[in-house]
Structures are given as structure tokens and as C-alpha cells.
Amino acid sequence: MNYVLAVKSPVYGKQGAFLAYQFAQALLEKGHVISQIFFFQDGVSNGNGLVYPANDEFNLTQAWQAFSAQHHIPLHLCVAASQRRGVVDALTAKDTDHTNLAEPFSRNRVVRRRVSMSAMATVLLRTK
């Protein structure tokens, strides 16, 4: 089955983004395909390259980066949500020497429609 994942939980403070990461791994282990992962609302913090967890904490941003590189799955951030939360790239930063969008995350207005329309399921993980 082909999936598009949508993550709205922050990189730290709640466990939703980590659960989404584990879910994405489990999908691939079961032979499913993930076309892309879209981060919106507080989930855009997963693409902040300036997040530095404590040495004894799991670095979720780095985990998403490695996951994307290993499986060739694009990671997209909502443009409006990332702008509001200060996650900027060279195109949107007032000072292009100071950006914090982590590679390979990219900013997109919406989940790419062609890909998401071809997906068999779009999954939005919600946690309280």
C-alpha cells in the first residue's frame, strides 16, 4: 500500500512525532511504500536544524534526516506554519546567513497533490 504521512506534533515535548517516525519505519518493514512525509502545525519543528537535544536524548531531527536519505522519501514542511514558527530557508530568511531549515527537509505549500492523490492512504497521527 502507498502512504503519505502527515505529522503535526512537535519534535520534542510530545511523543506524536516520535510515534510517526516509528510508524514510518514499521510501514517500510512490512513492505509498504511512503511517497512523502508532510509536517505541519507544530510538526514543522522537526525540520529545525538548530534543535540540539541533550546528549542522552534521541535526536529526532537527525533520525528523520537519516530515514529520508536511506529510503529516498521526501520530507516537506508547510510554508506558512514553518514561517510562523521561525523555520526558514535562504529564500525566506531576512538574513540569508542565518537559516535553520535542516537538509533534506523542504518547504511546500501543501502536500504534493499528484503524489497524495495516488496514495492509497494518507495517515494523520494524532496524540493528546
Predicted regions and their residues:
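Short, conserved active-site loops that position catalytic residues or coordinate cofactors/metal ions
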Residues: 38-48, 81
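Short, glycine-rich nucleotide/cofactor-binding loops
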Residues: 4-18, 47-52
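A glycine-rich helix N-cap at a beta->alpha junction
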Residues: 53-82
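Hydrophobic beta-strand scaffold residues
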Residues: 34-35, 75
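Helix C-cap/helix->beta junction micro-motif
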Residues: 30-31, 71
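N-terminal glycine-rich phosphate/adenylate-binding segment common to multiple enzyme folds
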Residues: 79-128
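Histidine-anchored nucleotide/phosphate-binding helix
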Residues: 16-30, 37
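Short, conserved beta-strand edge motifs with alternating hydrophobic and charged residues
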Residues: 5-6, 36-40
